């Protein structure tokens, strides 16, 4: 298993500067008992790549438990009550932010930012915007509407400051409304209160529509078409956006590689929006060659280089991504094999690999 780390060059166009790092410490997560790695994190999970993404994603937000399961148990090491992840984000302007997340098997979550306890995972996500591109991400166009709603919500969350309060109030109104429906008919007083709150949330959503349109259409060749409205039967929690080509859905008329490429471009478009908002976004790209051919892989490398962001990419075939970058792009290569992480020289055949990390606490 190989991993590429694309360093972040200086924005002014001069020679590459030292990229912002995200050093991390891991305590009793699955496959790793205790580890401290600077710049790049990896550990074995079958092939050895996914535990790295578990831990780095946790530094951004506890948005998932496992890439293969929605349960929490696959993340926590066997016979351990909890797992803990620490991260340190170093920004280009010299600011340092310390992040910490701990969660036990009962589901209790503790988040600390700069030594202070925080209650909302949104504060953690705001501290480190992170985009994940993996085989599941390629189903953005053909998956359930919930996937596309989450995609748009992520972009607006990092661009529009008004989004989170409006979204929270809308979710509260929907929970109250659903609770009333489960207990029978809604009395006129409760119905009027709920309608008034939903109308306010509709007003907020109209103000945020411009942000959603930028997330869905900017930097793309074809726009999305909203197929939902605020009436019955489609309500805001049932909203969806689909893309049409010659009045036909792409999932029925386009090749799989084309659909995957459109999904990737949507992710890249969100990176541009975050960048315009003066934020830093990190990309985690898992098993890229499995979904994109050589032409599209090279195109993705160019798009990532234009973003000037920090990127972590894994692949099984070293040659599949070795030639994708420009010669002036700083790239670090890591090889993972049986809990041993080595850093071979770019362009070498792997005979003189220098070990960079070998922890006896990692369990194969």
Curated annotation (Swiss-Prot):
<keyword id="KW-0963">Cytoplasm</keyword>
<keyword id="KW-0547">Nucleotide-binding</keyword>
<dbReference type="InterPro" id="IPR042174">
    <property type="entry name" value="RecF_2"/>
</dbReference>
<feature type="binding site">
    <location>
        <begin position="43"/>
        <end position="50"/>
    </location>
    <ligand>
        <name>ATP</name>
    </ligand>
</feature>
<keyword id="KW-0067">ATP-binding</keyword>
<dbReference type="GO" id="GO:0000731">
    <property type="term" value="P:DNA synthesis involved in DNA repair"/>
</dbReference>
<dbReference type="GO" id="GO:0009432">
    <property type="term" value="P:SOS response"/>
</dbReference>
<dbReference type="InterPro" id="IPR027417">
    <property type="entry name" value="P-loop_NTPase"/>
</dbReference>
<keyword id="KW-0238">DNA-binding</keyword>
<dbReference type="GO" id="GO:0003697">
    <property type="term" value="F:single-stranded DNA binding"/>
</dbReference>
<dbReference type="GO" id="GO:0005737">
    <property type="term" value="C:cytoplasm"/>
</dbReference>
<keyword id="KW-0742">SOS response</keyword>
<feature type="region of interest" description="Disordered">
    <location>
        <begin position="345"/>
        <end position="364"/>
    </location>
</feature>
<dbReference type="InterPro" id="IPR003395">
    <property type="entry name" value="RecF/RecN/SMC_N"/>
</dbReference>
<comment type="function">
    <text>The RecF protein is involved in DNA metabolism; it is required for DNA replication and normal SOS inducibility. RecF binds preferentially to single-stranded, linear DNA. It also seems to bind ATP.</text>
</comment>
<dbReference type="Pfam" id="PF02463">
    <property type="entry name" value="SMC_N"/>
</dbReference>
<dbReference type="GO" id="GO:0005524">
    <property type="term" value="F:ATP binding"/>
</dbReference>
<keyword id="KW-0235">DNA replication</keyword>
<dbReference type="InterPro" id="IPR018078">
    <property type="entry name" value="DNA-binding_RecF_CS"/>
</dbReference>
<comment type="similarity">
    <text>Belongs to the RecF family.</text>
</comment>
<dbReference type="GO" id="GO:0006302">
    <property type="term" value="P:double-strand break repair"/>
</dbReference>
<keyword id="KW-0234">DNA repair</keyword>
<keyword id="KW-0227">DNA damage</keyword>
<dbReference type="GO" id="GO:0006260">
    <property type="term" value="P:DNA replication"/>
</dbReference>
<protein>
    <recommendedName>
        <fullName>DNA replication and repair protein RecF</fullName>
    </recommendedName>
</protein>
<dbReference type="InterPro" id="IPR001238">
    <property type="entry name" value="DNA-binding_RecF"/>
</dbReference>
